Amino acid sequence: MPKGEGKVVSQNKKANHDYFIEETYETGIVLQGTEIKSIRAGRVNLKDAFAKIERGEVFLHNMHISPYEQGNRYNHDPLRTRKLLMHRKQINKLIGLTKEQGYSLVPLKIYLKNGFAKVLLGLGKGKKKFDKREDLKRKDAKREIERAFRDRQKGLI
């Protein structure tokens, strides 16, 4: 199964707007019982989330998983730091890359694969304001071309 294939629960659309994503990694995530139930219900927000490498392990910060509605007083903390599961070789590679100026680890999406929650982690370099404007211009031009082509096709048929 290719990376990122499975039932997508949540996507971080802002990540592609703010970063040039150069590589992606599929990681497992350590969760508590009520957290996986909330994820399956789609109650996850990746908007402000980021990953950090601490003591040779990868941790995900600021990912909001809403408390499980049918949970009891032992429900989880919505913004707790969660450990990501990766191979040692991948972590060592990321340590070297994130030490370089401007590289960040950003969660792109969270999805369910074979019953397990997975996080697609992207290694990205921050975009400057002019890069974002350039991307918007490129998207608008592409949209205009597609619209003109579609209108032309309708006229010919």
Swiss-Prot record:
CDD domains: SmpB
GO CC list: cytosol
Subcellular location: Cytoplasm
Family note: Belongs to the SmpB family.
Listed SUPFAM superfamilies: Small protein B (SmpB)
Name of the protein: SsrA-binding protein
Alphabetic keyword roster: Cytoplasm, RNA-binding
Secretion signal, residue range per the UniProt entry: none
UniProt GO molecular function: RNA binding
Pfam families: SmpB (PF01668)
PROSITE patterns hit by this protein: SSRP (PS01317)
Primary site of residence: cytoplasm
GO BP terms, alphabetized: trans-translation
Cystine pairs: none
Name of the coding gene: smpB
Presence of the UniProt keyword Cytoplasm in the record: yes
Function: Required for rescue of stalled ribosomes mediated by trans-translation. Binds to transfer-messenger RNA (tmRNA), required for stable association of tmRNA with ribosomes. tmRNA and SmpB together mimic tRNA shape, replacing the anticodon stem-loop with SmpB. tmRNA is encoded by the ssrA gene; the 2 termini fold to resemble tRNA(Ala) and it encodes a 'tag peptide', a short internal open reading frame. During trans-translation Ala-aminoacylated tmRNA acts like a tRNA, entering the A-site of stalled ribosomes, displacing the stalled mRNA.
Domain of life: Bacteria
NCBIfam families: PRK05422.1, smpB
Species of the source: Bacillus licheniformis (strain ATCC 14580 / DSM 13 / JCM 2505 / CCUG 7422 / NBRC 12200 / NCIMB 9375 / NCTC 10341 / NRRL NRS-1264 / Gibson 46)
